[in-house]
Amino acid sequence: MAEITTIARPYAKAAFDFALEQNAIENWVEMLNFAALVSENETMQPLLSGSLASNQLAELFIGVCGEQINEQAQNLLKVMAENGRLVVLPAVAQLFVEMQHEYAKEVEAQVVSATELTSEQQQEMSASLEKRLARKVKLNCSIDASLIAGVIITAGDLVIDGSVRGKISRLSDTLQS
């Protein structure tokens, strides 16, 4: 995963800098997400790792994307095809979105809870995280009954495990050592 991220980062950074300069970040998010979906398509996968010449692969890929991508995005895809990097498009799209959030001082927090959180609980959690992270927080909530009770919050590098399952696991580890 780290290798893919290392390969994808310069492409994402170049695209983000260009999109920022052109004031077209949202448009680029849509184009990169669409291109990433195309690259993940099961019909396209063998072609990306196949023996097509880079210019043929780029033209084929751009043809499949059609009107969904503009000329500048086509140029990015051509460069990536020349370097054999179209397979990392999903990582490029993901890194681009992360750069967008970083630029906007936003962070997405994944919240997994044992039961559904009320809107009041979500608001309190969001406010608390915004204060702690000094960023605007967008919560993505999901439910996992195996937590027994409590929540697990993941926001960037921050992980807060306040679940009963996590506490039992830590207690078990302590008793076994």
From Swiss-Prot:
Membrane topology: Peripheral membrane protein
Compartments where found: Cell inner membrane
Pfam families: OSCP
Record's keyword annotation contains Transmembrane helix: no
GO molecular function, one term: proton-transporting ATP synthase activity, rotational mechanism
Main location: membrane
UniProt KW Cytoplasm keyword: no
Keywords: ATP synthesis, Cell inner membrane, Cell membrane, CF(1), Hydrogen ion transport, Ion transport, Membrane, Transport
Gene Ontology, cellular component aspect: plasma membrane; proton-transporting ATP synthase complex
Signal peptide extent: none
Subunit structure comment from the entry: F-type ATPases have 2 components, F(1) - the catalytic core - and F(0) - the membrane proton channel. F(1) has five subunits: alpha(3), beta(3), gamma(1), delta(1), epsilon(1). F(0) has three main subunits: a(1), b(2) and c(10-14). The alpha and beta chains form an alternating ring which encloses part of the gamma chain. F(1) is attached to F(0) by a central stalk formed by the gamma and epsilon chains, while a peripheral stalk is formed by the delta and b chains.
Job description of the protein: F(1)F(0) ATP synthase produces ATP from ADP in the presence of a proton or sodium gradient. F-type ATPases consist of two structural domains, F(1) containing the extramembraneous catalytic core and F(0) containing the membrane proton channel, linked together by a central stalk and a peripheral stalk. During catalysis, ATP synthesis in the catalytic domain of F(1) is coupled via a rotary mechanism of the central stalk subunits to proton translocation.
The family this protein is said to belong to: Belongs to the ATPase delta chain family.
Name of the protein described by the UniProt record: ATP synthase subunit delta
Source species: Shewanella piezotolerans (strain WP3 / JCM 13877)
Encoding gene per record: atpH
